[in-house]
UniProtKB/Swiss-Prot annotation:
This is SPRY domain-containing SOCS box protein 1. Gene3D superfamilies: 2.60.120.920, SOCS box. The gene is Spsb1. It comes from Mus musculus. Substrate recognition component of a SCF-like ECS (Elongin BC-CUL2/5-SOCS-box protein) E3 ubiquitin-protein ligase complex which mediates the ubiquitination and subsequent proteasomal degradation of target proteins. Negatively regulates nitric oxide (NO) production and limits cellular toxicity in activated macrophages by mediating the ubiquitination and proteasomal degradation of NOS2. Acts as a bridge which links the NOS2 with the ECS E3 ubiquitin ligase complex components ELOC and CUL5. Pathway: Protein modification; protein ubiquitination.
Length: 273
């Protein structure tokens, strides 16, 4: 689970009021997942073939990284000194809600580990060690080690994320977490251990944005697994009803759906079959 570090380590649960922001201006922030995002996360993940379609682009990368032949969801960075290297995903998104999982071992992050989105024009290489994703107006990035958000970083100040952190606190981002890009609302958010961290960036609507990361650690390997997407159309009533039933049952009782006194077709629908 994501953790805050001050003098010691504290587990963060945003549902616990003791971890709500102390700053008055942050207390109104919503840490509940939006309805569409909640529905998407309840859906089964897409097939491996679809994941490959949304994976790292071996033709759109720094020359110091490459997509692995034996697992095309992972890219590897060569141990090149004084270099920051990035790679984009294959698909640029202009509409809909999209969620992907990033798996990046904490021990392989080094001084500048940044995850976010970028246009096709964002640079993918820089000399020296830097926060490459978010350094200009073509990309938006979350620096995992610094807990800072960067966009047009050469001209704009960074912001704390998650926003509930106090100045003396650090949020430890685990090896795996989720990225949620909503091109209909124009927002980028992150989810850690099932907890919605709030909106990181706004104003993305009307752009074409690709998943991106920038790294400095030699031999680091970063996996991106596309989970699913939702079109911008209104959510069907049947889907909303299914979600309500599954919520009422709770995750621990979903396995009991086949035993419910319901028609077989309805039980199959509740199980996404």
């Amino acid at each position: 689970m994501g953790q805050k570090v001050t003098g010691g380590i504290k587990t963060v649960d945003m549902r616990d009021p003791t971890y709500r922001p102390l700053k008055q201006e942050l207390q109104g922030l919503d840490y509940c997942k939006p309805t569409r995002l909640d529905l998407l996360l309840d859906m089964p993940p897409v097939s491996y073939d679809v994941q490959l379609l949304h994976s790292w682009n071996n033709n759109d990368r720094s020359l110091n990284v490459f997509v692995k032949e034996d697992d095309k969801l992972i890219f590897h960075r060569h141990p090149v000194a004084q270099s920051t290297d990035a790679i984009r995903g294959k698909v640029g998104y202009t509409r809909g809600l999209h969620v992907w999982q990033i798996t990046w071992a904490m021990r392989q992050r080094g001084t500048h580990a940044v995850v976010g989105v970028a246009t096709a024009d964002a640079p993918l290489h820089s000399v020296g060690y830097t926060t490459l994703v978010g350094n200009n107006h073509e990309s938006w990035g979350w620096d995992l080690g610094r807990n800072r958000l960067y966009h047009d970083g050469k001209n704009q100040p960074s912001k704390t994320y998650p926003a509930f952190l106090e100045p003396d606190e650090t949020f430890i981002v685990p090896d795996s977490f989720l990225v949620a890009l909503d091109m209909d609302d124009g927002t980028l958010s992150f989810i850690v251990d099932g907890q919605y961290m709030g909106v990181a960036f706004r104003g993305l609507k009307g752009k074409k944005l690709y998943p991106v990361v920038s790294a400095v650690w030699g031999h680091c390997e970063i996996r991106m697994r596309y989970l699913n997407g939702l079109d911008p159309e209104p959510l069907p009533l049947m889907d909303l009803c299914r979600r309500s039933v599954r919520l009422a049952l709770g995750k621990e009782r979903l396995g009991a759906i086949p035993a419910l006194p319901l028609p077989a077709s309805l039980k199959a629908y509740l199980l996404y079959q």
